[in-house]
Amino acid sequence: SDFSDALAEYGIPLLVYTTALAPGFDFDALRNLKSVPPWNCNANCGNYQEIKRFAGTDPRLREFQTLWNAIHSEWMRRWGTKVRGWWVDGAYFADRMYAFPDEPNGRSFAQALRTGNPDAILAMNPGMVYPPRAVDPNQDYLAGEVNDPEYGLLHGPMIDGMQYHVLSYVGQNWGRGPA
């Protein structure tokens, strides 16, 4: 709340970072939230060999998704319109988790992220995908994670009718080297 208020003084909206799966190096969270799939999620978590002992049997992670939706709904009940949007990292497996007509799915996750602020915007990051694309019809803008920001700009401000956004690193690589 304080952070949002401080940003508002400068007309800067607060967008919040979250993840599609629970934090990959918090073993208690992985186990308790039942966030480890029976399929290799190494592209997302980077340590599947280490965490696969916590893997469940449901390929859609329905129990996890239900818990994750409830957590985000609770946050949004508290934060309300102070959160103007979300950037969801690690939505690399949207086809395995969200692309279903029955809940939990992409629609129910988007609803959870908009609890308290139905106008909150949403991007789901499929990783570095060229050309950039949406992974769920409930998102409002493209996550735009790129290694070469200029590559994405060649497509213009809109891709498939969706606002393009660029997220890249400063320095030599992601989290490494001088800026």
Please provide the spans of the model-predicted regions.
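Mature catalytic domains of secreted/periplasmic carbohydrate-active enzymes
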Residues: 1-179
